Curated annotation (Swiss-Prot):
<dbReference type="GO" id="GO:0006096">
    <property type="term" value="P:glycolytic process"/>
</dbReference>
<feature type="binding site">
    <location>
        <position position="392"/>
    </location>
    <ligand>
        <name>(2R)-2-phosphoglycerate</name>
    </ligand>
</feature>
<keyword id="KW-0460">Magnesium</keyword>
<feature type="binding site">
    <location>
        <position position="362"/>
    </location>
    <ligand>
        <name>(2R)-2-phosphoglycerate</name>
    </ligand>
</feature>
<dbReference type="InterPro" id="IPR029017">
    <property type="entry name" value="Enolase-like_N"/>
</dbReference>
<dbReference type="Pfam" id="PF03952">
    <property type="entry name" value="Enolase_N"/>
</dbReference>
<dbReference type="InterPro" id="IPR020809">
    <property type="entry name" value="Enolase_CS"/>
</dbReference>
<keyword id="KW-0456">Lyase</keyword>
<feature type="active site" description="Proton donor">
    <location>
        <position position="219"/>
    </location>
</feature>
<feature type="binding site">
    <location>
        <position position="391"/>
    </location>
    <ligand>
        <name>(2R)-2-phosphoglycerate</name>
    </ligand>
</feature>
<feature type="binding site">
    <location>
        <position position="337"/>
    </location>
    <ligand>
        <name>Mg(2+)</name>
    </ligand>
</feature>
<dbReference type="InterPro" id="IPR000941">
    <property type="entry name" value="Enolase"/>
</dbReference>
<comment type="similarity">
    <text>Belongs to the enolase family.</text>
</comment>
<dbReference type="Pfam" id="PF00113">
    <property type="entry name" value="Enolase_C"/>
</dbReference>
<dbReference type="GO" id="GO:0005576">
    <property type="term" value="C:extracellular region"/>
</dbReference>
<comment type="pathway">
    <text>Carbohydrate degradation; glycolysis; pyruvate from D-glyceraldehyde 3-phosphate: step 4/5.</text>
</comment>
<dbReference type="InterPro" id="IPR020811">
    <property type="entry name" value="Enolase_N"/>
</dbReference>
Amino acid sequence: MGSSNLNINSKITDIFAYQVFDSRGVPTVACVVKLASGHVGEAMVPSGASTGEKEAIELRDNDPKNYFGKGVNEAVDNVNKVIAPKLIGLNAFDQLTVDQAMIKLDNTPNKAKLGANAILSVSLAVSKAAAKAQNSSLFQYISNKLIGLNTTNFVLPVPMLNVINGGAHADNYIDFQEFMIMPLGAKKMHEALKMASETFHALQNLLKKRGLNTNKGDEGGFAPNLKLAEDALDIMVEAIKLAGYKPWDDIAIAIDVAASEFYDEDKKLYVFKKGIKANILNAKDWSLTSKEMIAYLEKLTKKYPIISIEDGLSENDWEGMNQLTKTIGSHIQIVGDDTYCTNAELAKKGVAQNTTNSILIKLNQIGSISETIQTIEVAKKANWSQVISHRSGETEDTTIADLAVAAQTGQIKTGSMSRSERIAKYNRLLYIEIELGDKGKYLGWNTFTNIKPKNFNI
């Protein structure tokens, strides 16, 4: 992964980290890496609100007098005082050696000593500096040098745009965390984002007409005080039509249930805030068993133009996820996020057990770009789809847009058509589309190679 031939100009000469803020106004880590050539790489790391138990550790100061314990001075110090002295002099083109040096320095299974936020900030900044030193776009550098694809033809990702927020990302009654639109009928990246923008604004107008608030959640989607998943799905379908598009054919729906957030481990039940409709599955006490949850999700896919379900069951309910995949996975994308936490070993376990047919990829869940690529490669080998993802606490860093193109994942999940930290990724993709010209393809429905979507009429 990366060249080990040391060019004097590719030597790392300086590494400097400092504290900045994410999109929620919470501290996070930024890093600057300088090379002997004079090239500079800069990176900022994101932070999640709904986090998996098996994620690499995001190091916080836990000092209640500073940012209510959310400061990252310790992580910053770890970069400046521990990591930097060990990495200065290394070859920036040898990403694997750089990342492994930090992992060895940390010497914990989950990066608890130095912090995944510290390690990732350096990992990303090194890759950016190296790309500049090679006079290459970041996506081309990652693809050719880190992944080894050696291609000039790329796939532009279908976006999953979060238009209604619930769960841990919004202060409303909706239990499911994200309701997203996927412009699968588009032929080009810019056309897909046009469709998404028009649908987003059509939805805003519908919400206003119904007296529902149009405040935004963490990821830029609306957070109306709806009670049920069905309420959100109904108004989304209406918005797609109002924007002049056909539900399913032009724009399909993806949902992130984030079921771990409302799963009661002791009772082994999925407990809804206000409950789903009483007549659904004869649910009692507004809670569902794993089997009932699967039946509920299946029912939703028959009623609404849903193509993708993420974290439909708890991250520890592997048997349930397996059953969900068996039930609807032939034609619906079943994405594992908290289940795998971008961990290659967990992904291998999922492949062996047929737990899902897709994986969500988040850089900060594992904590380095080389480990992220390793997890993507596990999924590709299994013919699973991969979805590159942002976090709810984002920054203006656009690395994930380049990563999605570089790894040819075909899908990206990076928020709504509002909030500049989300739009930055879409704008980067628009530039990449122009840069690639006819060497960049937007696959639309053809992005799904391991499922056979059924025709859906609504």
